[in-house]
Amino acid sequence: MSTVTHPDTELHVHLEGSLEPELLCRLDPALTLAEARAFYEFGDFAGFIEGFKNAVRRLQQPEHYRLAATALFDSLAAQGVVYAEVIFSAGVVLWKGQDLDEVWAALREAAAEAPLRVRWNADVIRRFGAEPAEQVAAWAVRRASEGIVSFGIGGDETSCPAAEFTRAVAIAREAGLKFTPHAGETSTAENIREMVELGADRIGHGIRAVNDPELLALLRDRAIPLEVCPTSNVRTGAVPSLAAHPLRALYDAGVTVTLNSDDPAIFQCTLATEFAAARALGFDDRELAAIAENARRCAFDYGFQRAR
């Protein structure tokens, strides 16, 4: 394995969380830069959700999505990222009454011109419930040949039981899509276990697994990776400080961990800052290289893996 620690693979980055304040103002000329920056000033998870919503509200037409995607891709490429799996809130597009196919066409246009390889995770909001999740899963299956590799569930983990999404997950997985839910970010380890039982291929965040030795062993033995986002966890209050982050304990337990930026504009972070955070937690070059390699190995685009 290379000892180079430069990360080049991003597996957990939200399109809607990548809108810099300057871009928000471009999308909404009535918005001042000070107002846009204030959206991203918060101290807890509820405040983060409000900031995310304020960004989403500015995405009013397909062209806005194309501009957002292009800006994200250019930023990732400038960091040296060559492959990204981008989460976009397809469920929110439907909730806003927008034409999902038109938005998707704009995103595909941006991806076709991107200076890196892009694949997509079609995400739904947990509190919206089962029916829209099933609609998105069926839509994602129809678009799988166009770059969608996974189906995800995000949002408030306590808002709707995991079992409600059994059919949506089955629709996606039976057609060959992977399942990448958020779990164990702000709730309990039990939520991770429920998503594993639903068939999760990777877990977004998953840091609460550290509280359950049996779950740690399950994740390790089934080789289910965690998409860990340290800066995000600190900013949302999921952990009280970087020093208290369980990344080291997860890694030492043999769980496959990757590092990711999550919502880079909202949290003002990059993939590189997440590796710097890991170094601050005591990870050395060899361990950082292993984590970078985990992301490449856990990418859902197997053609990308073979090309490495």
Language-model features: where?
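Metal-cofactor-binding active-site regions of metalloenzymes
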Residues: 1-177, 187-191, 197, 201-202, ...
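Conserved hydrophobic beta-strand within the GNAT/NAT acetyltransferase core sheet
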Residues: 179-181
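Acidic/histidine-rich helix-loop elements
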Residues: 184
